[in-house]
């Protein structure tokens, strides 16, 4: 199932939220009706919060069913809210505050529950990232861009990436994430940073409200969401 929506008129949903197979985080600005619809489409418990006193949740955090990485500028109150949410939903998730010069972990890491791709900008933290997310990783860029997280969206079934990703890079991504499908595409009528526009897991996807019909078809194919 795929749902189209905006967050207060904004279509870059992946910048402002995070979705995994088992949980989701959304900005405080999202109304309750939209929250319930997204929770239903993705079939996950979710909560609303800030990270580092910011709504840029998807840019700053990265997570999967095993772990969650947040920047060390995340406040104690925010960390406690996350811990409380995880406990209330009986989720055994490793939560790590990582100190790094570049705090945009969501932009620089692409992960599912089988593997992760780490931007060269975070290569020195590879072991920590692997341990927290409990997956093996590959370090590198694709489409000549270091922002591997914001230029891709991955689930345990498939992956959609920047349209300039070449064939060798597609094969590399597929091998690391261990998915059946890796496709190139766009969202929000031509935006190439698909990770900034889409929230997805193996059960559904939420896409920016500007996303066209042909783009939705490609997203469904790449993420294996066609019924």
Curated annotation (Swiss-Prot):
Q: What is the residue range of the signal peptide feature?
A: none
Which of UniProt's keywords are assigned here? Initiation factor, Protein biosynthesis
Q: Name one Pfam family in it.
A: eIF-6
- Show the InterPro entries listed in the entry: eIF6 (IPR002769)
Q: Does the keyword Transferase apply?
A: no
Superkingdom is Archaea
GO biological process terms, semicolon-separated: cytosolic ribosome assembly
Q: Does the keyword Acyltransferase apply?
A: no
Coiled-coil intervals: none
Q: Extract one GO molecular function annotation from the record.
A: ribosome binding
Q: Which SMART domains match?
A: eIF6
**What job does this protein perform?**
Binds to the 50S ribosomal subunit and prevents its association with the 30S ribosomal subunit to form the 70S initiation complex.
Which NCBIfam families does the record associate with it? eIF-6, PRK04046.1-3
To which protein family does this belong? Belongs to the eIF-6 family.
Q: What's the protein called, per UniProt?
A: Translation initiation factor 6
Q: Which organism is it from?
A: Methanococcus maripaludis (strain C7 / ATCC BAA-1331)
Q: What gene is behind this protein?
A: eif6
